[in-house]
Amino acid sequence: TLICGLCSCGLDNYDAPTASLSGAIIDKETKENVPGQAQNGTKIRMYEFYNDEWSVQPNDSWVSQDGTFSNTAVFTGKYKILAEGPFETVEPIEMEVSGSKQMNFEVTPFLRISAEATSNETGKVTVKTSVDNVLDKTIQAVEFYYCKTPYVDKNTFTAKESVELGTETELDIATYSHTFENLKSGKTFYFRVGALAVNPGGFYNYSKVIE
């Protein structure tokens, strides 16, 4: 006698995430976005409140180099939201997220970096920068970059020049300059300055990208 046993199993069906969270990391003093690093830089961490406890594994998203963020894969619910990056630690925010939610984090960056680029000779561009040591931290590195694409930071560049630091790092505001040479005429290049103040996460602060 042949007995055939048939067993059926059902797959749990979960609805896809339909909510989103977007916003910006904003300098508390200047009210401008805090420039960042697109990958392995500032991150937004979302811990969901589920079954009467906070999740252990966060829903992470990177902050763009212009200081904005957008996570479009969020389940509707209650979250504890943190921002980690090159700024003084900020308190987490608890909120309900549903639909298209917007929020900003106001922070005090370790360093404020401004930069400008000028070209007086063919094939040469001089980048000047001012580094404001907002929190009086030890500055470990100041770097000039240029890249052939708009995405430029300490990990993504065509060329990099590191500053030889001296006692000027003890100043509240220090200025530096570097001239990039042998740049092809008629091509578009993108310039940026990054600097590292001592911090546990090894996060860099940046200037805006200059085209």
Predicted feature residues:
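A short, solvent-exposed beta-strand micro-motif common in secreted/extracellular proteins
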Residues: 65-88
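Beta-strand-rich modules
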Residues: 180-204
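Short strand-edge motifs at loop-to-beta-strand transitions and within beta-strands
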Residues: 67-69, 101-103, 172-178
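Short, ordered, surface-exposed loop/turn motifs in non-cytosolic proteins
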Residues: 30-54, 137-142
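Bacterial Sec-dependent N-terminal signal peptides
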Residues: 1-32
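Structured interaction patches on ligand/partner-binding surfaces of diverse proteins
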Residues: 85-110
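Short, acidic Ser/Thr/Gly-rich low-complexity loop/linker segments typical of extracellular
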Residues: 49-66
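Recognizes extended acidic, P/S/T-rich segments that occur
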Residues: 55-59, 145-182
